Amino acid sequence: MLEHPQRFVRNIPDSSASSQQYPQQQQHPPQLPQHQNLNLNQNQNLNQNQIYQYRPQVPVPVPGSPAHHQRHSSLSQQQQLHHHRTLSTASSCSAQHKSVTFGQPALDCGGNGSGSANGSGSGNSSSGSAAGNAGTQSMAGNMKHGKSQDDVCYVVAKYDYAAQGAQELDLRKNERYLLLDDSKHWWRVQNSRNQSGYVPSNYVKKEKPSLFDSIKKKVKKGSGSKTLPNCSPSRQVESPTMSRRLPPDPAEAIGTAVVKYNYQAQQPDELSLTKGTRILILEKSNDGWWRGQSGNSVGWFPSNYTTEDCDNDGEIHTYAMAENVLDIVVALYSFTSNNDQELSFEKGDRLEIVDRPASDPDWYKARNNQGQVGLVPRNYLQELNDYLATPYRNASASAGNGNGGGSNGGAGGGGGNDSMERRNEGNKPAAQSSGQPIERPNLAGKSWYYGAITRSQCDTVLNGHGHDGDFLIRDSETNMGDYSVSLKAPGRNKHFRVHVEQNMYCIGQRKFHSLDQLVDHYQRAPIYTNKQGEKLYLVRSLPKANGT
């Protein structure tokens, strides 16, 4: 057996994590940082283009088609014909080289796609300005060809989506949008603020018409009235957005894998790997390259740099879907927004950081537990891991702070008592955080802990005595020290592996400081979402036979 995986001949530098500095606890909130490249005044209304002028233009890897040889569509045709990768096999006793040449792209489809991309790329400036003006057009003017006011169609966002260009539009999960054009893979929609743009069609679903609308439409058709199609030549100009492929549907993940070795992406459509992280597997190619997602990044990576997670019976684990969350932070101070683009929060609230604008480093884009998104001051926040690991200081002062306890104790807050408990749990001796073996926590008194039972026994108990949403946590059969969360679900029970690493409980791409924290999170957030958008939660711990 080889000691190392097949590697690229090219040097692969190790990725190093950059450390971030956070402010120390202060008695009063620090001075708010100034927005850069954007003059935000109170009650100022901004259009879509102005809002994102200061945001970084993060290049998104262009996912390829299922045919692996068409992945590098951004290269010229001549480069595609000669493009190849060289893999080397390294072992302790010998070194062998193996060349893998990607197949030539089909000229009838791959060539056309590349040409379209190049052609549209040269017109970005003019098309971008046209898209900016499109946001202010009336609803009737933006209507799809041949549609009257009675034929309007709405779509509902299945996932959040951040626009990557001037012609795209942000999506917020469960929000309703007017459908303007669905003739391409990217649909043109309009939000409630009359802002329009292109969105990936697999991130939205059409809203079912009501019975009244259906009857009204039939009556309209019977009258024989027809609407002439709009033959405006400007509608024939294809947006640059339309030439690139759709981003992956988060529900289409076929499994997960753990990265064994660092890998630095060598091409724009590749995915860099960091040892020890978990990635979602979206697609597998028979040449050994898989397409995956890590955070906001999507791309191809060498499968032999990873280990796929499997059950004891060989079945791929179903993991909690990865969210586009860069970090979890805790508010050290309360903050009241001064304009529509900022997000208010209370001291102790927990926020999800979804973007760190490079051009405005003192402000983060965050989402609260109500799903609201906005800009927040960085120096008002602290990473959750650092917050939990900080010894509890000045307990009497915090206990006497009625405002802080009141806001945190509410259903919408972060939970003041919860923060104190988690912080105490995270305050472990230094020997444990240094990588030394630690003792398993005492879970005997937990209602959801069933100890060392097999998966078969677990399914028997869930199916015999449980209802949908009941769950239990058991010791992992295949990995000593790990756990499994088993959930009673319609049709077939779900099992989620919890990997324990450096005092952290990892499930999917999320990490928790305790199993209590994990259970608390997935009782409020879905632990699984299927392709139809149905969500599963940890509703209730499965009652034990003795009633404890």
Curated annotation (Swiss-Prot):
Residues covered by region (Disordered): 12-37, 57-92, 113-146, 219-247, 398-442
Transmembrane spans: none
Knockout or disruption consequences: Pupal lethal with some adult escapers that are sluggish and uncoordinated and die within a few days of eclosion. Defects in R cell projection patterns with abnormal axon targeting and excessive axon crossing over and bundling (fasciculation). Identical to Pak mutant, R cells fail to find their proper targets within the medulla neuropil, fail to arborise properly within the lamina and medulla neuropils and terminate as thick blunt ended fascicles. Disruption of neuropil structures in the inner optic ganglia.
Family matches, as CDD domains: SH2_Nck_family, SH3_Nck_1, SH3_Nck_2, SH3_Nck_3
Positions of the SH3 domain: 150-209, 252-311, 324-386
Biased segments, Low complexity type: 20-37, 123-135
GO molecular function, one term: insulin receptor binding
Location(s) in or outside the cell: Perikaryon; Cell projection, Axon; Cell projection, Growth cone
Domain SH2 residues, every copy: 448-542
Chief localization: other
PROSITE patterns per record: SH2 (PS50001), SH3 (PS50002)
Lineage: superkingdom: Eukaryota
GO terms under biological process: axon guidance; myoblast fusion; negative regulation of insulin receptor signaling pathway
Any one GO cellular component localisation term in the record: perikaryon
Amino acid composition bias (Polar residues), ranges on this chain: 227-242
Keywords of the record: Cell projection, Neurogenesis, Phosphoprotein, SH2 domain, SH3 domain
Outcome of substituting residue 363 to K: Probably disrupts the binding pocket of SH3 domain 3. No effect on interaction with Pak. Unable to rescue R cell projection phenotype in loss of function mutants
Gly residues bias (residue ranges): 113-122, 401-417
Role of this protein: Adapter protein that links cell surface receptor tyrosine phosphorylation to downstream signaling pathways and effectors, many of which are involved in regulation of the actin cytoskeleton. Recruited by Dscam1/Down syndrome cell adhesion molecule homolog and InR/insulin-like receptor. Recruits Pak to membranes, probably when dock/dreadlocks is associated with activated receptors. Required for guidance and targeting of photoreceptor (R cell) axon projections but not for axon outgrowth, differentiation or target induction in the developing eye.
Subunit structure: Interacts (via SH2 and SH3 domains) with Dscam1 (via cytoplasmic domain); the interaction is direct and requires Dscam1 to be phosphorylated. Interacts (via SH2 and SH3 domains) with InR/Insulin-like receptor (via C-terminal cytoplasmic region); the interaction requires InR kinase activity, probably for autophosphorylation stimulated by insulin signaling. Interacts with Ptp61F (via C-terminus); this interaction is independent of insulin stimulation. Interacts (via SH3 domain 2) with Pak (via N-terminal PXXP motif).
Record's miscellaneous remark: Dreadlocks is named for the distinctive appearance of defective photoreceptor cell (R cell) axon projection pattern caused by excessive bundling of axons in loss of function mutants.
Domain notes: Possesses 3 SH3 domains, which bind polyproline motifs, and 1 SH2 domain that binds phosphotyrosine. The SH2 and SH3 domains are cooperatively involved in the binding of the cytoplasmic domains of Dscam1 and InR. SH3 domain 1 preferentially binds Dscam1 PXXP motif 1. SH3 domain 2 preferentially binds Dscam1 polyproline tract. SH3 domain 3 preferentially binds Dscam1 PXXP motif 2. Interaction of the SH2 domain with Dscam1 requires Dscam1 to be phosphorylated. InR can interact with either the SH3 domains (all 3 domains required) or the SH2 domain.
Protein name: SH2/SH3 adapter protein dreadlocks
Source organism of this protein record: Drosophila melanogaster
Protein's gene: dock
